[in-house]
Amino acid sequence: ITLLLLAFLCLVPALRAQENNEDKPWSVNEATLFGVGGYNIKDTYLSPLKYSGWGMRILNERMKMTRLSDYRISRQQFINVDFAFTRNPAETASSFAGFVDYSLGYHYHFQPQPALKLLAGASVRALGGFIYNTRNGNNPASAKVETDLNLSAMAIYKFQVNNYPFALRYQIEIPV
């Protein structure tokens, strides 16, 4: 039995090498953003006041061509994580907030010119998070959940400056 198992394990990679793999080698475009900045939070369930402060964000975007429609449809996903610490105007109370946002979209590619790509598609987005107010005793926190469906369009223009490649991209999403 051990010999049979060993022969099988040696045979599987050889069979896999015989596959006719016609996958096109597409790159995955990925970008990650780390940010720190000012936040304004107003949740009338917790307080009628606007809380201001600072927060941190990590945003990751991945874009990849798929096999759909003869490799003319790309998949784009965003993952965004936010944390914020804010205080009321009198600085007598503070709040903490945290959100996770995920978006998944598919775009069909049109190429009217060699340097210009136009993309059209749709995306779905989901957000979950919380706001915790340190001053409230009875209802100290509120949960946030959102989902939406969006129409999405993108334009990508590629050019060179002194033999350095550049790309300009503009994207718009409209909730339906």
Locations of regions flagged by a protein language model:
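Outer-envelope beta-barrel architecture signal
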Residues: K24-T32, S69-Q77, P114-A122, N162-I172
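Short glycine/proline- and aromatic-enriched beta-strand/turn motifs that initiate or cap beta-hairpins
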Residues: A17-F78, T86
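Transmembrane beta-strands of outer-membrane beta-barrel pores
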Residues: V36-K42, V81-R87, V124-Y132, Y157-F159, ...
